[in-house]
Amino acid sequence: MFTLTPSAFAARDIEFVHKNKTEIVYLNNGSYITITLISKDISTLSLTSTDSATFTKVGNKVVTCRDKKGNLEWEYTLFAEFSVVENVSATCTSATYSQTIYASDWSFSNGNATKSGNTAYGVGTFKRKVLFVTVDTANIDISISCDVYGNLS
């Protein structure tokens, strides 16, 4: 889930639940947020005695913010790795994040990535300040899950 907390200059709350591979949320100030899920199989490792394929699945969920001119302001990426025994189990084995700020009026805090079962979670907060006053806040709260077939969502 992605939540943008409005400031005095914003007109409404925007809550985003990722359902597709790529989504775009347009903000009332002309900026927009893009959320993209990227996935790939790393390798087919083995077959178990029940002939279930065992493989590693890697996924990234990238959240970017651009201003109304299309200039990149910031980016947050959740990286996740899953071990999948096809049709049997999926386990998140690694969860990390990265963030990059491109516009100097934004800052980042409270970043973290965790894993539990078949899901990776990423959180963090971007804030934009003008004359030392916070005018925009973007709270990142996203996840990547893997099913027993290696499908990421």
Regions found by a protein language model. Name each.
Residues 48-153:
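Mature secreted bioactive peptide module from preproproteins
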Residues 1-70:
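N-terminal prepro-regions of secreted/extracellular proteins
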